[in-house]
From Swiss-Prot:
Stated family: Belongs to the universal ribosomal protein uL29 family.
Keyword Chloroplast: no
Domain of life: Bacteria
HAMAP family: Ribosomal_uL29 (MF_00374)
GO cellular component: cytosolic large ribosomal subunit
Example GO biological process: translation
NCBIfam families on file: L29
Organism: Burkholderia mallei (strain ATCC 23344)
Keywords annotated in UniProt: Ribonucleoprotein, Ribosomal protein
InterPro entries, per database record: Ribosomal_protein_uL29, Ribosomal_uL29, Ribosomal_uL29_CS, Ribosomal_uL29_sf
Record lineage: Bacteria, Pseudomonadati, Pseudomonadota, Betaproteobacteria, Burkholderiales
Name under which the protein is recorded: Large ribosomal subunit protein uL29
A single MF term (Gene Ontology): structural constituent of ribosome
Pfam family, one: Ribosomal_L29
Length: 64
């Protein structure tokens, strides 16, 4: 997800997106631990998406 898309969302939608990404990251980590994960680059993508969402949330909080 692009940062420009995230900037257009409100804080509630960003929190929901963050929650969904954290659940996805947990699932991917469990798949990795049980050796069921074939595409390990998904972990990196999800981790960076989480960072993007948190960055946008911080920016919006600092604007107020």
């Amino acid at each position: 997800m692009k940062a420009s898309e995230l900037l257009q969302k409100d804080q509630a939608a960003l929190n929901k997106e963050l929650s969904d990404l954290l659940k996805a990251q947990f699932g991917l980590r469990m798949q990795l631990a049980t050796q069921q994960l074939t595409n390990t680059s998904q972990l990196k993508k999800v981790r960076r998406d989480i960072a993007r969402v948190r960055t946008v949330l911080t920016q919006k909080a600092n604007q107020k």
